[in-house]
């Protein structure tokens, strides 16, 4: 097993070989120290967001083959001299740095720092301040640009960090230097907000009649940018045009969204009888007795702020009651309210914690692994046979234990028949690669299937000594009858086999009624369910049809018959006769060998495997060169040039791959898919690369939501292909934009399926739509 270690900045990546699943993190740190030269105490290792700690193994962190572990070099702080620290302490005690405290203490009623500038609170009036303490004003919300009714609670002036405070009577203080501390009347939870003069003005109190509203006039109107037909908040607006008929009055205006210059053009104002005049600065101050309050849009769209109506959105989400607001808790994650007596279990008092989370959002603190902590015990791994075994054998070096690095999603796991893009004759070095391709999913088991459905694939490996393999037809012995307790992979036959589990699954593929006593023979064997067959090099000792190395996909077979009999071990076993039924030629035939050459099918290795072998060979060569020669040899030593020539000969030449051939119907469907013409022009360039064409189609037409080949594709106006089901779920969540580029599609966007694209994908990936 090997992994890659990459520095956090991504500049240096090294491969570490000869590892095991049971390798300790402590040992991994030693290997990293040898490669990177980073001290042990300076290493911080991360894998999938977890910090790896000593005492655990790679298996505990589920580190897979060729996975990347990130290395962060811990910076050790420099130690300051003791004299320097004593000097700092003595300076502080002697009054060094006390100028800031003096200035703070001499800043009147109090001082604070905002945006790097000092604000000194003076009191009720500051120089040329337009408004005084307790004045009723309109204050602008800096995020929305809307105006809300507020009251001034204090006034201050702003000076630089090193400036001196002018006198209160100094008239040179400009309005921009005045800070108003206001409190919104309807939103006391926001506290006191500091605003400048441009965001504060006198409370609007004059409604304009229809005849006084002029085109070009700037007034204050009620508008809802999200729902224009509903009541919203109060914005400044410039009148664009007005129209009056016998039944209706219409006003269109440009709504101004704040001081930044943003605006909404040609907006229809619904509430034409509630248009306010903007008060000029310097007008008569309002008294504390406010005029009639303006009406804003409801905070809750569900209950329209009706106090008598129960609502689980703006009130307690359990009972919906609006009583006892002082006994409600607001979840800091989902923002839903809860009565303390509605919780399970109920609370007697409001908790004093700064943050509170509801039962659905709260994380179990006992399951959270903090940085520097050991991993929690996994119940799943504790039940494994390896956890209870007393054997000291290192089982973690085998390729069957590394786990899949990818998974086949083109077709579901219960797919019958060939896998799209995997031709007959494909070779893999290890069984885990066969699992990743989807041809045979189990890593170790010989039969893949379900006892109530059938068998999807099987592997011919070592098998039984009395199995017969004739290539196009072979006998196969079922599974079971062996004691595989603990972590054993194989054992001698010790009891009779039963027609259950995988044996029954393989029997269901036979086109005959199931019979668990005598077996059955198919009248029409071709009508049975197809089984994908993979031959392993371990079967070479029994069969000449097995590959010399690795695993080979040999095509589709059908079960002709199955029957029970006593094997050489003396116990009852179930035997199956399978016969080849595939239009692709067998890989051992003359036609099959020519097809393999045309398609350029060669042995497939895991990522990093060849590099690992090369590094091991270099290590062996270095060791042999470093070994002292005890006695002179009569033979001549080979020159490096000879070694290089032999190495060059061992590298296979790149074969010319046969082009992928499309049928006439497929070419017609591609031409009909006009919306994806640009994508198809790029994909068609891969026709000359044979089987890679199918992989390119899969990569190009991948749904960005489900990360699988699009099913019932909807080609958007921005030329992205999304599954109809995925886009429909997005629309139900009120997200009406393209998932790929966020282009606004609108609420009423039609979800029309691209039928030519669906047809061509169904032909290139037969069976991929099952289970979607």
Swiss-Prot record:
Residues 291-299 are annotated as: Linker. Pathway: Protein modification; protein ubiquitination. The record marks 477 as: Required to confer preferential recognition of cytosine over thymine. Keywords: Cell cycle, Chromatin regulator, DNA-binding, Metal-binding, Nucleus, Repeat, Repressor, Transcription, Transcription regulation, Transferase, Ubl conjugation pathway, Zinc, Zinc-finger. Its main location: nucleus. The keyword Chaperone does not apply. A zinc finger (RING-type) spans 703-742. Gene3D superfamilies: 2.30.30.1150, 2.30.30.140, Phosphatidylinositol 3-kinase Catalytic Subunit, Chain A, domain 1 (3.10.20.90), SRA-YDG (2.30.280.10), Zinc/RING finger domain, C3HC4 (zinc finger) (3.30.40.10). One of its GO terms (cellular component) is chromatin. The record marks 487 as: Required to discriminate between hemimethylated DNA versus symmetrically methylated DNA. A zinc finger (PHD-type) spans 297-364. Residues 331-335, 351-353 are annotated as: Histone H3R2me0 binding. It comes from the Eukaryota. The record marks 325, 328 as: Histone H3R2me0 binding. Multidomain protein that acts as a key epigenetic regulator by bridging DNA methylation and chromatin modification. Specifically recognizes and binds hemimethylated DNA at replication forks via its YDG domain and recruits dnmt1 methyltransferase to ensure faithful propagation of the DNA methylation patterns through DNA replication. The tudor-like regions specifically recognize and bind histone H3 unmethylated at 'Arg-2' (H3R2me0), while the PHD-type zinc finger specifically recognizes and binds histone H3 trimethylated at 'Lys-9' (H3K9me3). The YDG domain (also named SRA domain) specifically recognizes and binds hemimethylated DNA at replication forks (DNA that is only methylated on the mother strand of replicating DNA). This is E3 ubiquitin-protein ligase UHRF1.
